[in-house]
Amino acid sequence: MITISDAAQAHFVKLLADQPEGTHIRVFVISPGTPSAECGVSYCPPDAVEADDIELEFNGFHAMVDEKSAPFLEDASIDFVTDQLGSQLTLKAPNAKMRKVDADAPLKERIEYVIQSEINPQLASHGGNIMLVDIDEAGIAILQFGGGCNGCSMVDVTLKDGIEKQLLDMFPGELTGVRDVTEHQHGEHSYQ
């Protein structure tokens, strides 16, 4: 469920040494499965352990995960990185905003998952996003751009060289192309 690097495990052991005996860590997601999902790590004293918590054993401590957060922490990783600027704990949870779908889920659900977990985070750097409207009988994903992508002069390049290429590579034989149905209007909201 959660991978914690050796460096992060050593860091947690050091932090927990200053806490009351029996204190572990809690890894959680606030508003899981939503665009505003936030992940966190906190101390978990013995009296804060819930009956339905999932207990993960690590080197010198345990990590508690509440039942509601668990599916959104699949494939999560925690690392402790040190560089010339200092050190920091990093938590990456690719499924926090949307639960990972099974490989045999309907094509629409699998494409929606890729859009939310991989494509939209890239477009967000320009204030943009895309939404899957439908998949037609010919296997073409109908997409609609929003935010900074609406009216952007580079939208065709983003669509064909970025999004379409990525989706066709991920869904060969199932998807035949993508089509933009956005009524683009260049304005102050547009990226370029």
From Swiss-Prot:
Keywords, sorted A to Z: 4Fe-4S, Iron, Iron-sulfur, Metal-binding
NCBIfam families, alphabetized: PRK11190.1, YhgI_GntY
Cofactor: binding details: Binds 1 [4Fe-4S] cluster per subunit. The cluster is presumably bound at the interface of two monomers.
Swiss-Prot/TrEMBL cofactor(s): [4Fe-4S] cluster
InterPro entries (UniProt xref): Fe/S_biogenesis_protein_NfuA, FeS_biogenesis, FSCA_dom_sf, HesB-like_dom_sf, NIF_FeS_clus_asmbl_NifU_C
Name of this protein: Fe/S biogenesis protein NfuA
Highest rank taxon of the organism: Bacteria
